[in-house]
Amino acid sequence: MKFVEIRDLQVTYMGKDKPSIVVDKLDIEEGESVLITGRSGSGKSTLVSVINGVIPHLINAEIKGEVRVFGFDVKSTPIHEISKYVGTLLQDPDTQAFNYTIIDEVAFGVENYMISRDEMIERVEESMKIYGISHLRDREINTLSGGELQRTILASVLAMRPKALILDEPTSNIDPQGTREILELVKTFRSEGISLVLVEHKIERVLPFVDRIIVVEEGKIAVDVRKDEIVDKADFLYSLGLEIPDYMLFLKKNGFRKIDYEYLRKTYTYRPPSRIGGKGEALYASVKVKTKNGIYLINTKISLKQGTITALMGKNGSGKTTLLKVIVGLIDKKRLIVEEEKVIVNGVDLSKTKLVERGKFIAYLPQFFDVMFIKRTVEDEIKFSMKNRGTYDEKRLGEVLKMFSLDAYRKEDPLVLSMGQRRRVAMASVLAGGAKVILMDEPTSGQDWYHRQILGKELLELRDKGYTILVVTHDSRFVDRFADYLLVMNEGKIVLEGKPEEVFIKSLRHGIEPPLEYELGGLIKNEHFS
């Protein structure tokens, strides 16, 4: 039996004139693992939403053609029946959590299956153990980091024992260690015969764990190949804006059709890009934050040089987001004790200022940015932000829309856009305000390589105009390409700092993986990757 059978599919959202995706034929065999990739907004999420029944049962859209999952007609089968066979991890795990604590969330789906209490407990305990969250069982959902929340939702899905899993960017919000753990689980799922669809931008990372690669471009399947053919298609995939590493292009140029690591280690060289040093101190912060029980979550100092891009990396739960929230004045002082909060921006002491005043000096983009949207159109959202900060004019609005490739979406509701597009709306809104120091929490999460490069180039332009930027990210290739400095945080402290190539040499001990080019190009010896 096939996992997926699609024939003559067209999906058109309400209010749209043309289909968002058109697929003449697509088959996925039972037990097969498939990577679906493509640029943000290309139609990937629409395709998987048809496979799991979200379209048309939860999202109102017109479907033409035939879609079958394990033999069931998706259009006529209730979604609760489809969910018994197909489990899904959504792109933004925050939208998938409904309960107060972790154990309640993991048990929620299984409870609806009306199985015995003993079996339910067994499934819940097994799932929490597999995902490493057993010790967090009584934690409140709203206190979890992005990675912890993602593991919780995955555990909830796994507890329902589906025949197939759809993982919509499962590594987008987690650190390298978490990525390795999830991919090891993918390996386990494959060995157990579970059918898998992974929607991912990180082609390089998931390649060993899939059988096929499907590329969606402008609502159509542009490429459908076995994974062994990826080097042969490297140039074309790169032209589509996908994250094809430099060493794959090097192999293609030298006549290879498959990846040959032995050849690469003998012949491939890599040199990091040039960086600037910066002059003067744009931001200094000394922060100490502890729980009501006296456990320090943050105990560190941070300094950003004027007119530079600094990346902040670290494991999930290391304190990166908490540090940013203290600096911008968003920390919950009823839940946590702020022992020290010294913040100086461009010589101005903001330590005792309120949130509104601090916001004139520091712009902040949170990790889960959908909560920022309060207007019905992209244009009005950015306009509202600019007016609040006294920076609005029509010409500037147009420039911001074009800068973030949003001009074509100016009349769209931000909440109906893809995650990558929504993130660009949030970034445009924050950066349109005029603050000279910008803190961004995971702006690369969920973005394809094409738009990450656009983001990086925009940050370089802002840097060259005198802006100082701090970017929290797990994306080491983005850091290597665009950051001037790299800070590594562990257990609430900055433990490494310097230029990325200096820090990457020492970063593995703190769970930070350099781009593979560093090892293949001889910048880091093989034993560092053991």
Curated annotation (Swiss-Prot):
Record-linked Pfam families: ABC_tran
Enzyme kind, highest EC tier: translocase
Molecular function via GO: ATP binding; ATP hydrolysis activity; transmembrane transporter activity
InterPro entries, sorted: AAA+_ATPase, ABC_transporter-like_ATP-bd, ABC_transpr_CbiO/EcfA_su, ECF_ABC_transporter_ATP-bd, P-loop_NTPase
PROSITE patterns: ABC_TRANSPORTER_2
GO cellular component: plasma membrane
SUPFAM superfamilies, per database record: P-loop containing nucleoside triphosphate hydrolases
CDD domains (UniProt xref): ABC_cobalt_CbiO_domain1
Family, per entry: Belongs to the ABC transporter superfamily.
The protein's name: Putative ABC transporter ATP-binding protein SSO2030
The organism of origin for this protein: Saccharolobus solfataricus (strain ATCC 35092 / DSM 1617 / JCM 11322 / P2) (Sulfolobus solfataricus)
